Amino acid sequence: MSALAAFRQTAGRGQGDHTWFATPGLNLTFSLLLRPDGLKASDSVLLSCTAALGIRDYLLGAGIDAGIKLPNDIWTGGRKICGLLIENMLEGKYVRTSIIGVGLNVNQTLWPAELPNPVSMKELTEHSYDIREELPVLCRCISARAGMLATAAGRAALKEEFDNNILHII
């Protein structure tokens, strides 16, 4: 797995025509390149499971309990802390490469009025984070979850835990 982070993201995007807002230097905005060996395209939802649960693990380590809001968000306390965007390149019936875009609100405390319900780690924990130190920690959490893709038992465990952490927000 490889990561490419942006200290300043100028054209962040989300699902559909949504954009991602991040003040330069305050948040983690990065993409992961993953080459899941032997993952069938029909099982590509497991890549969402991998990323979302890895991010959830990271947040739990920071004392933040979070859940998954389908299709691609991580929420805590009724507010959005992270967004995901996953694009897969297929080769036949298999996922050859996956690019997982992550936008995690880390130190941001001021938000544009048009953003609905954003929250950051700093707002929740009253602690400032060095994003350069936090990125490898978060990547290790996601990488550990990606390792579960290698076996049928790991894939089943990912799916079950993912399903158990879906938020039902009305």
Identify the role of each PLM range:
Residues A5-F7, S31-L33, K69, L85-E87, ...:
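Short beta-strand segments
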Residues T10-A11, Q15, T76, L104-V106:
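Short, glycine/acidic-enriched loop or turn micro-motifs at the edges of active sites
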